[in-house]
């Protein structure tokens, strides 16, 4: 089994780097960070910071780096469950990190472009801010999950699958909150919404999975 020979060094580096990013965020943006921790529990964070729409702020950028970092670590962990032979190396790590970052930033750019084309810049900016906040929250959750899976449960199959359910639940809950906040806009453009889900949410994930699963570089 691949999980039996996986070195934990990369997870130690990921955990320490991620903790440093979170610590820097909390130190520089204490009030913002504390409000952000209640993102799923209530709507205070969105109400307070939604009008600013600063999805390219330093605060979000640091949390975005943390998200990409922990996503790569989680992909390594999940690959052990699927027995996919992902090579653990700096090169592979950087490729995966770049793919995830490029995918997410690319989606943001496309959404901004669509907002400009259809003259819904403000609504699209709000949608992007909500989605980025939701994803960055997932990044925070993945930090303890990854550490527990590696250092406590030692890549246990049940623990990995349970963690996947938890992560998916958080993502779905964040999507529901986003849909509720933009329900009028969605209902008024329902066909475009379905097209958006298929092309910008589901489609790229399938392509990314096939690319990673079939790549000779990973």
Residue ranges of predicted features:
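Hydrophobic alpha-helical transmembrane segments of multi-pass integral membrane proteins
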Residues: 17, 60-78, 101-102, 106, ...
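Alpha-helical transmembrane segments with an aromatic anchor "belt"
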Residues: 84-151
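Long, highly hydrophobic alpha-helical transmembrane signal-anchor segments
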Residues: 1-14, 66-88
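Alpha-helical transmembrane segments
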Residues: 7-23, 90-103, 160-165
């Amino acid at each position: 089994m691949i999980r039996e020979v996986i070195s934990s060094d990369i997870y130690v580096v990921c955990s320490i780097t991620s903790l440093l990013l979170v610590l820097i965020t909390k130190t520089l943006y204490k009030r913002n960070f504390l409000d952000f921790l209640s993102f799923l529990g209530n709507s205070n964070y969105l109400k307070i910071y939604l009008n600013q729409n600063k999805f390219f702020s330093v605060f979000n950028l640091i949390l975005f780096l943390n998200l990409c970092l922990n996503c790569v670590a989680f992909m390594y962990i999940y690959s052990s469950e699927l027995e996919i032979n992902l090579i653990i190396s700096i090169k592979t790590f950087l490729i995966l990190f770049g793919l995830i970052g490029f995918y997410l930033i690319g989606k943001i750019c496309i959404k901004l472009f669509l907002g400009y084309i259809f003259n819904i810049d403000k609504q699209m900016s709000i949608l992007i801010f909500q989605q980025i906040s939701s994803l960055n929250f997932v990044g925070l959750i993945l930090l303890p999950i990854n550490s527990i899976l590696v250092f406590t449960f030692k890549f246990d199959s049940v623990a990995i699958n349970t963690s996947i359910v938890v992560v998916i639940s958080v993502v779905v809950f964040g999507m529901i909150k986003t849909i509720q906040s933009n329900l009028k806009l969605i209902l008024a453009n329902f066909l475009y919404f379905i097209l958006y889900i298929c092309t910008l949410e589901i489609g790229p994930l399938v392509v990314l999975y096939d690319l990673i699963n079939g790549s000779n570089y990973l």
